[in-house]
Amino acid sequence: MPARIAHLSLLVPDYDAALDFFRRIGFECREDTELGDGKRWVRIAPPGGDAEILLARAVGDRQAASIGEQGGGRVWLFPETDDFARDYQRLEAAGVTFETLPRDEPYGRVVIWRDPWGNRWDLIENTRSDRG
């Protein structure tokens, strides 16, 4: 079995709008390759991040209905930061919807927010010394 997860697909309605949003919150585009028939292979990640998000333009009613609901209503994307204040301000400037105020938990500083399509994210600055 592979030793790591390389990509996670995120359904979006439009590649360019998604790229614009993710660039505004500090992600970088690692690849944007045309595949024909309007399909692209678009990989994004936070700078220095290992795992990547593959932006997938929804095709058909089933996929379109899943945009923003891939986590089934749960927080399911957990970017970890080394500078909570910087990234919180970046999210705020990008106009995300915050569901909570920033708070301290036993594992770190967190805030729950939604992207433009409704996906729930949890920005975390881990403060535990026993990460593993």
Regions found by a protein language model. Give the residues of each.
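Vicinal oxygen chelate
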Residues: 1-7, 25-80, 86-116, 124-132
